[in-house]
Amino acid sequence: MKFFIDTANLEQIRKAHELGVLDGATTNPSLMAKENIRGTENCNRHYVEICNIVEGDVSAELIATDFEGMVREGEVLAALHPRIVVKLPCTAAGIRAVKYFAAKDIRTNCTLVFSIGQALLAAKAGATYVSPFVGRLDDISEDGVALVAHIVKVYRTYGYKTQVLAASIRHTQHIIQCLDAGADVATCPLAAIEGLLRHPLTDSGLEKFLADHARLNV
């Protein structure tokens, strides 16, 4: 499973990259606003900065909600950098845009996916990635991980090439559950990625090794 970091914070992206396990990054308008990045030109420059850090794909989300606007914005985003993936919502206009971009070899990430039906249409339209939102489904007492597993099963059964990118990951357990479900990618906050490293027995074992070494090398 690939690891993407879900943030627009350059410091966090660099920190994840330094671990040596980062495969890409995802952003959205809320994450850009959190970093106080305003205006189209500033956003576009920021996407390029992220691409200069991350060696894999970087999802940049468009703002338009109509088909024509999505096409205009998406073509601009795709031209910024070869590793930019155009991120767009799973709506009627979004599915039309995915089909349009697929015909032009522009890669897409169909986001805000909450049902198997949405995931099916995204794959049929030719999306590169589909992003089911695990945490947001859990928030309304639905099973986000079960949706990931269902999408994986359908895609494998029918041979769809669209990659399942598990999103809205809240904690390390979500990552492990999505791994078990067969997700191709999990996009996570830095804290969740770092959480995979932590285990009390690792800490206590290292402490004992160091103490024993110090005792024998006084």
Report each predicted region and the residues it spans:
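Catalytic cores of alpha/beta
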Residues: 11-19, 69-73, 97, 115-125, ...
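Glycine-enriched alpha-helix->loop->beta-strand junction motifs that scaffold or abut catalytic
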Residues: 20-24, 80-84, 100-108, 124-131, ...
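A contiguous pocket-lining binding segment that forms or flanks enzyme active sites
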Residues: 111-165
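Active-site beta->alpha loop and helix N-cap motifs at the rims of alpha/beta catalytic domains
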Residues: 3-5, 9-13, 19-21, 27-100, ...
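C-terminal alpha-helical cap/extension of soluble enzyme domains
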Residues: 155-218
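Glycine-rich phosphate-binding active-site loops on the catalytic face of alpha/beta enzymes
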Residues: 29-33, 112, 129-140, 183-202
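Conserved, mostly hydrophobic/aromatic
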Residues: 28, 86, 122, 178, ...
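Alpha-helix-loop-beta-strand connector modules within alpha/beta enzyme cores
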Residues: 44-58, 95-108, 144-164, 207-218
